[in-house]
Amino acid sequence: MTKDRRAALVRITGRVQGVCFRDWTREEAERLGLDGWVRNESDGSVTALIAGPDGAVSRMLDHFWKGPPGASVADVASEEASSAEAPAGFRITRG
């Protein structure tokens, strides 16, 4: 991972399913030029792997707290990850 590129594995909890959170995440990530994926989890949370320029990753982590209209985010937990794990582009996956 280069100095200006980073990746984060993120778990978002709250009312984040049934509110187009994955579509919103993909749109925001593409707008910010991030690579990675997002998926719903069976416990009602959403998990995402985001990778790209440090500033863009930081902005996306901030955006997760707001989410799309209808979402009510309770927590955004992130940990550093390897950017090599992120596919090129951004996609919605299934858990």
From Swiss-Prot:
Molecular function GO terms recorded: acylphosphatase activity
Naturally occurring in which organism (per UniProt): Rhizobium meliloti (strain 1021) (Ensifer meliloti)
Lineage of source species: Bacteria, Pseudomonadati, Pseudomonadota, Alphaproteobacteria, Hyphomicrobiales
Gene3D superfamilies xrefs: 3.30.70.100
Enzyme class: hydrolase
Keywords linked to the UniProt accession: Hydrolase, Plasmid
Active-site residue numbers: 22, 40
Bias type Low complexity, positions: 76-88
Protein name per Swiss-Prot or TrEMBL: Acylphosphatase
EC number annotated for this UniProt entry: 3.6.1.7
Residue ranges of the region described as Disordered: 76-95
Superkingdom: Bacteria
Database matches in InterPro entries: Acylphosphatase (IPR020456), Acylphosphatase-like_dom (IPR001792), Acylphosphatase-like_dom_sf (IPR036046), Acylphosphatase_CS (IPR017968)
Record-linked Pfam families: Acylphosphatase
Family, as annotated: Belongs to the acylphosphatase family.
Boundaries of every Acylphosphatase-like domain copy: 7-94
SUPFAM superfamilies: Acylphosphatase/BLUF domain-like
Presence of the UniProt keyword Hydrolase in the record: yes
Catalysed transformations (reactions): an acyl phosphate + H2O = a carboxylate + phosphate + H(+)
